[in-house]
Curated annotation (Swiss-Prot):
Keywords: Amino-acid biosynthesis, ATP-binding, Cytoplasm, Glycosyltransferase, Histidine biosynthesis, Magnesium, Metal-binding, Nucleotide-binding, Transferase. Belongs to the ATP phosphoribosyltransferase family. Long subfamily. GO terms for molecular function: ATP binding; ATP phosphoribosyltransferase activity; magnesium ion binding. GO terms for biological process: L-histidine biosynthetic process. Its EC number is 2.4.2.17. It holds the Pfam family HisG. The keyword NADP does not apply. It catalyses: 1-(5-phospho-beta-D-ribosyl)-ATP + diphosphate = 5-phospho-alpha-D-ribose 1-diphosphate + ATP. This is ATP phosphoribosyltransferase. NCBIfam families: hisG, HisG_C-term. Its main location: cytoplasm.
Length: 282
């Protein structure tokens, strides 16, 4: 089965980090290789431009892929957004030169030239507003075009706004919010491999900011110790061979850990061990 991932751009590194975190290691380091085997024996990775991935998944030749919500909308491809992946967040905005004095889209004059690689989104957005603009298709960086006199405005993804500011541009409207998504061909939504992948990704994110804590507790102190633990469900309690001592373990928020450990010691807990959680699957 083939999984499409970005070959370049802002989504590449976070995607590789996520795959590594769920145990799907790429088994070839040559970045020129377009099809790469992985440590998941039933999955090979195919590298592609993020804007092409919705079309590739829609074809059915590739079961799933990682790309931006903006690219999914732009493509109009018939794919299912199975998961929001928590990275690559930004806003698709209309921006104009600060010197123009324009504050809103309503102030754009008829015939305004809007440079963008999101041509379909641009046409639909301005058509819904009843604005007559000229869309200038661009495949690379668009921020410089107003300075060159090639465009009067741009429609592009803004993460922090720094790039716009450097080029003397200000956003005047948000077209849509975007982030990285796991997309799946409709016929594979309920496939076992899709369930496996989504389960491991969700488990990885669920484990973020949490630690596993183990401790021994005398029977006489058990009730006080359990009252300290903010378990997701309930702490697990196991009697040890000695009979008057229990082993207790639980999941706790990492930012609350220092305070919890002190309170556990005061309540009578001993032999406290804290470990990281790789994945938390419920």
């Amino acid at each position: 089965m083939l999984l499409a991932i970005p070959s370049k751009g802002r989504l590449l590194d976070p995607t590789l980090k996520l795959l590594e975190a769920i145990g799907m290691r790429l088994l070839a380091s040559d970045e020129r290789a377009l099809v790469v085997p992985t440590s998941w024996r039933d999955v090979n990775v195919i590298r592609a431009r993020p804007e092409d991935i919705p079309y590739i998944v829609e074809s059915g030749k590739v079961w799933a892929g990682v790309t931006g919500h903006d690219y999914v909308v732009e493509s109009g491809a018939s794919v299912v957004e199975a998961l929001e992946l928590g990275f690559g967040r930004g806003r698709l905005v209309v921006a104009v030169p600060k010197s123009s004095g324009i504050k809103t889209v309503d102030e754009l004059p008829p015939g305004t030239r809007v440079a963008t690689k999101f041509v379909n989104i641009a046409y639909n957005y301005f058509a819904e507003l009843g604005k007559r603009v000229r869309v200038v298709r661009v495949t690379g960086s668009v921020e410089i075009l107003p300075q060159l006199g090639i465009a009067d405005a741009i429609l592009d993804v803004m993460a922090t706004g720094t790039t716009l500011e450097v080029h003397g541009l200000v956003p005047i409207a948000t077209v849509l919010e975007t982030s990285a998504r796991l997309i799946v061909h409709p016929s594979y939504v309920n496939h076992e491999l899709t369930k496996k992948l989504t389960t491991f990704i969700q488990g990885y994110y669920a484990a973020q900011g949490k630690k596993m804590i183990f401790l021994n507790v005398p029977a006489s102190r058990l009730e006080k110790v359990l009252a300290v633990l903010p378990a997701m469900e309930a702490p697990s309690v196991t009697p040890l061979a000695k009979g008057d001592v229990y082993e207790v373990f639980s999941v706790v928020p990492e930012d609350e850990l220092p305070d919890i450990v002190i309170r556990l010691k005061e309540a009578g807990a001993k032999d406290i061990v804290v470990t990281p959680i790789e994945k938390l699957i419920s």
